[in-house]
Amino acid sequence: MKRYTKHPVGAHYGTRQWLLQRLTAVVMAGYTLFIVLALVMHRPLNYPAWKSIFSEMWFQVGTMLFVMALLYHAWVGMRDILMDYLRDTTVRLTAQFAVAFVLLFYLVWTAAILWGR
Amino acid sequence: MSAAPKTRPKYYDLNLAHLPPPGLVSILHRISGAALFFPLLPIALYILHVTLGSQEGYDRWAALFHRPGVKLIVILAAWGYAHHFFAGLRYLLLDLHIGIEKVPARTSAVIVLVLGVVSALFVAWYMWSIQ
């Protein structure tokens, strides 16, 4: 019986993206638990409490890390979706470009919200 | 030799109720993921922007959150986030070859669907409790 060994082709970035999508998911899951806990502890919520949560240095850094993880996670996920449904290369690459632009916009916007004033 | 490819009949079963639980979890994971990317995340960032910006902005949104329609949207958004969260945890376990057999995979899929709804109910309780 002849045995075939599969020769993987390509740049191997698929495996790396697959793994990083999962690592970023774990980062976001941790942050999610923190913010749910913070919201429950500060109940009933008011403006000073809301403001004080987001003025904590560690929470600002955590929020930024969350959005950075989200940027990569959503890029892989949206790219998967676009590759499944958009067959025309020009249309798909245009859509992918739009997704990347929007994600970078979210990242910069988050930084502006956290430290912009 | 190459003839034109035969046109095959296409049939898309778009009725999600026909899917087994793991299939339902999967397509809802995809739909919720896309919805979180747009428009839920920019809406969340906008609300964060306004509510952190000033007391007036905070009060404006606090008043908006009293509206039943807005509450419903928040509950739906929370359900989407929670479903994506728990379905994602299930995929992490499946990637580790935990619960990969047919029966446990179906059971975990049902658990994910239930936890998504329970989380949405929790958010509903939270919103009514802070008033």
What function would you assign to each model-found segment?
Chain B
Residues 1-131:
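Membrane-embedded alpha-helical bundles that constitute the cytochrome b-like, heme-associated redox core
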